[in-house]
Amino acid sequence: MNQLTHFNEQGRAKMVDVSDKSVSTRTAVAKSSIKVNEVIHDQIINHKNKKGDVLGVAQVAGIMAAKNTSQIIPMCHPLNLSGIDISFEWDISDGYEIFITCTVKTTGQTGVEMEALTGASATALTIYDMTKAVDKGMIIGPTYLEHKSGGKNGDFNR
């Protein structure tokens, strides 16, 4: 499948018609990360950030973003998502980096890759927003699709 599906015969943007696609369970896992300094790391793990629980707020922001993906990505279908999970893992072997995993699931006619990517991205952006007073030099990314399952194109694993 090397054809772009979001364009009509005139080369204009369109939202793909999925009404003929079969309903199936679809899952997507996206990942992102943010590199922070030691002060931010210590604030987060000790719950000492002045704006509150950084990871708790970021987790809720990521869930909200995944739920609202069709409002910010023009050709995404509004979906009834059956589950969203966002988890965090620290790597302090070479600095301070938070790895973000966003898993999204639905039963429907189109996939949830964009919802997972949007959720992971918004989570990282929220961590940045809540800690930028300490250091604006944080680095976000890479952000990428790790896995998807369901649908006619089958599974994808990075």
Curated annotation (Swiss-Prot):
The active site is at residue 129. Disulfide bonds: none annotated. It comes from the Bacteria. It catalyses: (8S)-3',8-cyclo-7,8-dihydroguanosine 5'-triphosphate = cyclic pyranopterin phosphate + diphosphate. Pathway: Cofactor biosynthesis; molybdopterin biosynthesis. Transmembrane segments: none annotated. Gene3D superfamilies: Molybdopterin cofactor biosynthesis C (MoaC) domain. One of its GO terms (molecular function) is cyclic pyranopterin monophosphate synthase activity. The keyword Lyase applies. InterPro entries: MoaC (IPR023045), MoaC_bact/euk (IPR047594), MoaC_sf (IPR036522), MoCo_biosynth_MoaA/MoaC (IPR050105), Mopterin_CF_biosynth-C_dom (IPR002820). The keyword Lyase applies. GO terms for biological process: Mo-molybdopterin cofactor biosynthetic process. Substrate binds at residues 75-77, 114-115. Its EC number is 4.6.1.17. Keywords: Lyase, Molybdenum cofactor biosynthesis. Belongs to the MoaC family. Homohexamer; trimer of dimers. Catalyzes the conversion of (8S)-3',8-cyclo-7,8-dihydroguanosine 5'-triphosphate to cyclic pyranopterin monophosphate (cPMP). This is Cyclic pyranopterin monophosphate synthase. It comes from Macrococcus caseolyticus (strain JCSC5402). The lineage of its organism: Bacteria, Bacillati, Bacillota, Bacilli, Bacillales.
